[in-house]
Amino acid sequence: MSHRTSSAFRAERSFRSSSSSSSSSSSSASRALPAQDPPMEKALSMFSDDFGSFMLPHSEPLAFPARPGGQGNIKTLGDAYEFTVDMRDFSPEDIIVTTFNNHIEVRAEKLAADGTVMNTFAHKCQLPEDVDPTSVTSALREDGSLTIRARRHPHTEHVQQTFRTEIKI
């Protein structure tokens, strides 16, 4: 496979042509990097415009983003974990919560009367090791917040077993 036919080459070429053709925006021209920048800086600058909202400073708390401006928060409440997600644009029949392989996934799809998709939502996260995956429950409140709870396994004291085995030759 030639390097000119690789998907990385096509993506870079496409990005360069779209960047150079959008001369109407002065902000995109000011963000253009010279050719001598290291590859990682170039890659970061290419994607930071599209994905910059996902990069959180280390000082911000970790939360589950629901919508721009609305974040869900994970909490430990006694013997359970709980997090909420803003789903006010969706009705209960639009929302599907699934658990699999120690992960939880929230998906929603709002359809228009003509069958076209008006709005979608998807979030997937890994459950902590001490969660019972069969105990996951969800409830949609009247204010549109979806609350998901999962029970923690009872804390058991881990006792390291020590033993010795002799094998006769």
From Swiss-Prot:
Pfam families: HSP20. GO terms for biological process: heart development. The keyword Nucleus applies. GO terms for molecular function: filamin binding. The keyword Chaperone applies. Residues 1-37 are annotated as: Disordered. It is found in: Cytoplasm; Nucleus; Nucleus, Cajal body. Found in both cardiac and slow skeletal (soleus) muscle. Residues 16-32 have a biased composition (Low complexity). It comes from the Eukaryota. Coiled coil: none annotated. Residues 61-169 form the sHSP domain. InterPro entries: A-crystallin/Hsp20_dom, ACD_HspB7, Alpha-crystallin/sHSP_animal, HSP20-like_chaperone. Keywords: Chaperone, Cytoplasm, Nucleus, Stress response. One of its GO terms (cellular component) is Cajal body. Residues 1-70 are annotated as: Required for localization to SC35 splicing speckles. Belongs to the small heat shock protein (HSP20) family. Interacts with C-terminal domain of actin-binding protein 280. This is Heat shock protein beta-7. It comes from Mus musculus.
